[in-house]
Amino acid sequence: YPKADKILEIGAGNLNHLKFEKNFKKYDVIEPKNYLLEIASLKNKKKVNNKYADIKLIPKNSKYDKIIAIAVIEHIENLELLFSEINLHLKKEGKLVIEIPAEGEFLWWLGWRMTTGIGFWLKYKLDYGVIMKYEHVNNAKIILNKIEKFFKIEKIKSFPLNIQHARLYIHIVCSKKHY
């Protein structure tokens, strides 16, 4: 992850990503589900400067060196609004780091189908795919296309292979477009 003084984490959950960030001066989070922040460790809670329930609640003059969204973007309905707000808060030379499941690609589908899909069916006799349509409202292709409209993609890394349809997870580093 690129190092940064001022960081904003979108969808911080229980603050489990904090251990990967070093030497920052300010760490703000967006988390609409307050109970997730409540179960975070006291050590991590002390490192957080500001907590917001929504990106629109961040003061317009707040700028960040790095904005991160780990396993969050696939859940957001209005990506255009989110990316517009991120652009507002990302410093000119700042970095946006996004990690998403490679949903919609073959290996992701196969892995999901053979693990969660079967497990859910065996336990509940229900198709988890129906639930996933409401949980993950965007697949990887949609997300990558929207990112390209708002940001310059500097790097894409994938796990386990850096090949489309042979990946489970995608790590994207972006910067602002300079016109």
Label for each model-derived stretch:
Residues I68:
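A conserved beta-strand element that flanks and buttresses the S-adenosyl-L-methionine
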